[in-house]
A protein has these predicted regions:
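Conserved DHp (HisKA) dimerization/phosphotransfer helix of two-component histidine kinases, i.e.
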Residues: 48-98
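Acidic ATP/Mg2+-coordinating residue in the GHKL
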Residues: 166
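Short beta-strand/loop element within the Bergerat-fold HATPase_c
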Residues: 146-158
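Short conserved segment of the HATPase_c
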Residues: 171-183
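Conserved catalytic submotifs in the C-terminal HATPase_c
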Residues: 100, 105-115
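Conserved HAMP-HisKA connector
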Residues: 1-20, 32
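Detector for a conserved hydrophobic position within an alpha-helical segment of the HATPase_c
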Residues: 204-205
Length: 241
């Protein structure tokens, strides 16, 4: 039998992804239905933090799987005005168990006024959670006490930006040109597929935006950041549908 390395396995499995996603959603629908039935039979349970967490995370898995289905299908994406601040907070909340461990070393800066962009909110959630999970991984991997992670919402003219910065391991110059290539990963086998950044950029581009690694010379970059990514979307004021 042909021996496959980790990258070969990912490449061979990729065409099966839409079918696998479909199969995973079947038992997930059963979990969501069971949670709803439990809340109906025992109304008090739906007010507990444990039930709310289970329901929210199961719904998030379903949303994530549907997002992946849409990405693999390659069909048109409806672009509508949506509140970026609210969407960013949703993405952050999905990683709250990991973020809580950072305490004051994590910060979210959304600005004084609501920012409204044009695009697909679920795709932005997908991209932010990917970037934020990578940032948390980098800080944990570095292991230096005091490593920070920050999410900011900026408003350059005609755009809305979401920036994810971290004080983790950093990214070597030699690998930066390959970051968004499919199946490229710096993580050990079993820790990463090499599809995360590729799919995050694909999601943002299909939403009408851009995703890039921020240069050290960028004046808006966090001065302490070892790595910073920026998502840019048209603002609702000057965007074209």
């Amino acid at each position: 039998m042909k021996e496959l390395d980790h990258r070969d396995l990912i490449e061979e499995a990729e065409p099966l992804a839409p079918g696998l996603i479909h199969e995973i959603r079947h038992p997930l629908m059963g979990i969501l239905a069971g949670l709803e039935l439990l809340a109906r039979r025992i109304p008090a349970v739906s007010s507990t933090q444990e039930w709310q967490l289970l329901n929210e995370q199961a719904a998030r898995i379903d949303e994530l799987l549907r997002t992946y289905q849409d990405l693999f299908a390659g069909g048109p994406v409806e672009r509508l005005p949506f509140p970026v601040d609210q969407t960013v907070r949703r993405a952050v909340s999905l990683l709250s168990p990991r973020i809580r461990k950072l305490g004051a070393r994590f910060s979210l800066e959304a600005g004084p006024a609501p920012a409204v962009a044009v695009g697909a909110a679920p795709l932005l959630v997908h991209a932010i959670t990917n970037l934020l999970a990578n940032a948390l991984d980098a800080v944990e991997e570095r292991g230096t006490p005091g490593g920070r992670v920050q999410v900011r919402v900026l408003r350059p003219p005609g755009r809305v930006q979401v920036r994810v910065s971290d004080e983790g391991t950093g990214i070597a110059e030699a690998i930066r040109p390959h970051l968004f290539q499919p199946r490229f990963t710096t993580k050990p086998p079993g820790k990463g597929t090499g599809l995360g950044l590729h799919l995050a950029r694909t999601a943002i581009e299909r939403s009408g935006g851009e995703l890039h690694l921020v240069d050290a010379e960028d004046p808006a970059r966090a001065s302490w950041a070892r790595t910073e990514f920026a998502i840019s979307l048209p603002s609702s004021g000057g965007a074209q549908r």
